């Protein structure tokens, strides 16, 4: 049985708050991908300027409310499985799913919240 299923696995939620820098561009890659159960999946968003690690990552499944996964680049929110992790390399911020499970097929969003200087 082919367990490969297409999944929209990354998107962006760009919100602005008073005092937040609105001139920062966020670029996603890939915009979507297909993956098999058990695979390691990496999703990246790139900031056009330094956001000092101020990045949150979210997950949304069809028909469900959005769920907060990771704050400040790499800190897991309470109850988030350990197969999820976040990392940073320069201006690239990644969400990594160590071993994809069926419940992980969803849309994923990043939110930068860097403060103004």
From Swiss-Prot:
Region (Framework-2): 57-71
Positions of the UniProt region annotated as Complementarity-determining-2: 72-78
Signal sequence extent: 1-22
Sorted UniProt keywords: Adaptive immunity, Disulfide bond, Immunity, Immunoglobulin, Signal
Annotated stretches, region: Complementarity-determining-3: 111-117
One GO BP annotation of this record: adaptive immune response
Domain of life where this protein originates: Eukaryota
InterPro entries documented for this protein: Ig-like_dom_sf, Ig-like_fold, Ig_V-set, IgV_Light_Chain
Gene3D superfamilies registered for this protein in UniProt: Immunoglobulins
Annotated segments matching region Complementarity-determining-1: 46-56
S-S pairs: 45-110
Parts of the chain that traverse the membrane: none
Annotated Pfam families: V-set (PF07686)
Any Gene Ontology CC annotation: immunoglobulin complex
Protein name as annotated: Immunoglobulin kappa variable 9-129
């Amino acid at each position: 049985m082919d367990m490969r299923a297409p999944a929209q696995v990354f998107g962006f939620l760009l919100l602005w708050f008073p005092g937040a820098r609105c001139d920062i561009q966020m670029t996603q890659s890939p915009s979507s991908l297909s993956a098999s159960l058990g695979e390691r999946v990496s999703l990246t968003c790139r900031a056009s300027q330094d956001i000092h690690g101020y990045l949150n990552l979210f997950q949304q499944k069809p028909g469900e409310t959005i769920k907060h996964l990771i704050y400040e680049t790499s800190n897991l929110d309470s109850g988030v499985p350990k197969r999820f992790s976040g990392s940073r390399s320069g201006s690239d911020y990644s969400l990594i799913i160590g071993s994809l499970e069926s419940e992980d097929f969803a849309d994923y969003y990043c939110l930068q919240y860097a403060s103004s200087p």
